[in-house]
Amino acid sequence: MQGLAFLAALACWRCISLTCGATGALPTTATTITRSATQLINGRTNLSIELEFNGTSFFLNWQNLLNVITEPALTELWTSAEVAEDLRVTLKKRQSLFFPNKTVVISGDGHRYTCEVPTSSQTYNITKGFNYSALPGHLGGFGINARLVLGDIFASKWSLFARDTPEYRVFYPMNVMAVKFSISIGNNESGVALYGVVSEDFVVVTLHNRSKEANETASHLLFGLPDSLPSLKGHATYDELTFARNAKYALVAILPKDSYQTLLTENYTRIFLNMTESTPLEFTRTIQTRIVSIEARRACAAQEAAPDIFLVLFQMLVAHFLVARGIAEHRFVEVDCVCRQYAELYFLRRISRLCMPTFTTVGYNHTTLGAVAATQIARVSATKLASLPRSSQETVLAMVQLGARDGAVPSSILEGIAMVVEHMYTAYTYVYTLGDTERKLMLDIHTVLTDSCPPKDSGVSEKLLRTYLMFTSMCTNIELGEMIARFSKPDSLNIYRAFSPCFLGLRYDLHPAKLRAEAPQSSALTRTAVARGTSGFAELLHALHLDSLNLIPAINCSKITADKIIATVPLPHVTYIISSEALSNAVVYEVSEIFLKSAMFISAIKPDCSGFNFSQIDRHIPIVYNISTPRRGCPLCDSVIMSYDESDGLQSLMYVTNERVQTNLFLDKSPFFDNNNLHIHYLWLRDNGTVVEIRGMYRRRAASALFLILSFIGFSGVIYFLYRLFSILY
């Protein structure tokens, strides 16, 4: 504290000089300051400092100061204070800053932290050598000591705001336990660099334009405890730079006067309210949504989007700060709640890295929390996970993200996920739409599966392949049209409404041209809106789509390149590869013979690459008529119904997992068996390697009606011709 008082004295002397025209001189070298300090101590220990311009006064004890601060440190403080700087230079620095008209003061201190341990819950003081298996339950419904969790977050001490970094000349150097973030946009000569720091007490984010003089163009956003913000040098004070504050936190912006308008694109008071009135979980999800919106607009790497990314990075760091601050303010924190918050922050960093590949983070570890989570998920069986309420399933999946070391997710969890997805899929086939709740769970499953290593158990691998096939079945032409419509309005999206089962599907044909063909034909969507929706959905699909080809064993049986594959259909005993060229060593069905304008082949391959007991030469697809809902048993189980358009190719796939799905396949809401569209065809991909075309009575009736219409037109033409002939003759 004595050091801070010393800094304040130096800083305020500069303020007095600027505002009151003081001409007094202070010592200008380290030797002089040390000698002057000695003389002060010999004369009197306490120095009284009075600031005439605002009536502030305080005492500085030099003896205590020198007991705490060494001579080299005192020299550094003196040099950093730039006390000998020409006052005209200091005045120029001040005049280069933008100052808000006033500080908006908001009553109260915002939200209450949500992860307090209920009085009825047990708490555990985890220390070195703690036996984690002694922790109860499997859902983290107990408290652990907060300081240990906080120590994992802030495990590294950093030297910040060094004097040789011009963009930080507004701050005094300091050492602090912190987490560091950075993003680089553009090249090293003319690009933009963004740096961020999160400590237990504050957040600082800096925007540095490399193409200009850093001291004049660096911009800073700060959030935190007002009395603990980094010390400023004398040409400005926090009271002048604070945009909004409440009883607990303050939001400060240090912006250049010549460019502040490009950075003040949003209302900072509203941003402050969003930060302080939302729970950390709600606020984190808001930032996730914003990053998805930036990704959808393809603005992640655009240098002109740097002001937006500056603000997003600031909000992202504040989300991390709010979680850490909540932990810091309590002796114990509830495990399940903190795991949920950590999982959301992890996903936030992940999508930020997808959007901005140069995004880096150093710190914010979860060693203790990961050990606790690992113990909890080890007790969750597959059937238990499948039977838990939705909120508890989300808790388990959050703990998996923290507790699965090196991506090694327990087999019981993977099997449980397969069961959860099958239940969700069966429910989906009653309505053929997905709500936000289902999409939220899918997002959690996506995070776990895309981070996990392939399971060693072949049985679990096969179940996961069936799971991916169920996600593929929910990626219908209806779903594609819905997502294009949503992404046509990226600013109205939320993170869950933006998630699609297509991200976990086995379709590889969803390029922009294909998506445009599936766009809704509605007057509500203009051509511009369709283009925006197609581009946005394609961007996110490219970023989040599961890299699933390496999970399909049968792919190794052929030398086909990935760009030729349209979709894969892994059934229990055979894998179908739908592609634009025929595969070797497979039973090949050429779909192009059935009216399709572009080539499409369906190749049947066994997972172990062995042959079939029937001819593997190119085969014609037989036709079955009059298929309808089976009255008994499940003849369609473990097979797939595929629909395709004559012009646009593959539309939808439907994996029949049980009798209920089989029955729901024929509902009016089903995307299959359209009575009114003769351009849509349906194939039945069976588990024995045979493919059959399905044509129902609806097709025969339509053909008969068409024949009657053509016959009537022809007959009418003949009558008219005879009438004209007789008119001429008679």
Curated annotation (Swiss-Prot):
Keywords: Fusion of virus membrane with host cell membrane, Fusion of virus membrane with host membrane, Glycoprotein, Host cell membrane, Host endosome, Host membrane, Membrane, Sialic acid, Signal, Transmembrane, Transmembrane helix, Viral envelope protein, Viral penetration into host cytoplasm, Virion, Virus entry into host cell
Name of the protein in question: Envelope glycoprotein H
Single Gene Ontology BP annotation: symbiont entry into host cell
Complexes and interactors: Interacts with glycoprotein L (gL); this interaction is necessary for the correct processing and cell surface expression of gH. The heterodimer gH/gL seems to interact with gB trimers during fusion. When in complex with gL, interacts with host EPHA2; this interaction triggers EPHA2 phosphorylation and endocytosis allowing KSHV entry.
Signal sequence, start to end: 1-21
UniProt PTM: N-glycosylated, O-glycosylated, and sialylated.
Pfam families: Herpes_glycoH_C, Herpes_glycop_H
Homology family: Belongs to the herpesviridae glycoprotein H family.
Gene this chain is encoded by: gH
Record field: transmembrane: 707-727
GO cellular component terms given for this protein: host cell endosome membrane; host cell plasma membrane; membrane; viral envelope; virion membrane
Region of interest: Interaction with gL: 190-254
Residue intervals annotated with topology Virion surface: 22-706
Species in which this protein is naturally found: Human herpesvirus 8 type P (isolate GK18)
Subcellular location per the Swiss-Prot or TrEMBL entry: Virion membrane; Host cell membrane; Host endosome membrane
Intravirion side: 728-730
Membrane topology designation: Single-pass type I membrane protein
Role played: The heterodimer glycoprotein H-glycoprotein L is required for the fusion of viral and plasma membranes leading to virus entry into the host cell. Following initial binding to host receptor, membrane fusion is mediated by the fusion machinery composed of gB and the heterodimer gH/gL. May also be involved in the fusion between the virion envelope and the outer nuclear membrane during virion morphogenesis. Targets host EPHA2 to promote KSHV entry.
Glycosites: 46, 54, 101, 125, 131, 188, 209, 215, 267, 274, 365, 556, 613, 626, 688
HAMAP family, per database record: HSV_GH
